[in-house]
């Protein structure tokens, strides 16, 4: 099962943004109990997952995941079991993951970090933009709309249906 949400690399916008937001929101919680961090993660993770699902459907007309078959789900967008996973992830990230990443970043020379950050940000911005365009074109193509310009021809050649179905195997048009 693919958890990737971008056409280049095994990157997940949902998980990547969740880690970034968790880092910002939890950085002042180091002295809190694990149960408090867990509860925060359950609530915030569930809210975040619900919003991501709704935004994905609004922007792309696609449902990327559907939890309707789970007990205690809300509109199939989120369910209680996965909210618990978000809580566990919050504790693991704050206590183990982030400290390891911070130590690893300390090994990178100070003058290299800004350039690494800029290059990674540019790559991810291009990757997200291209992924959005490819997904929009895929939706048009499956509706029988032929390419209208060179960009759409490029997208059809490089991001054909088979590739898009590998990247987004669970996506369902609404």
State where each predicted segment sits.
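Aromatic-rich, lipid-facing transmembrane alpha helices and their immediate juxtamembrane interface loops
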Residues: 1-174
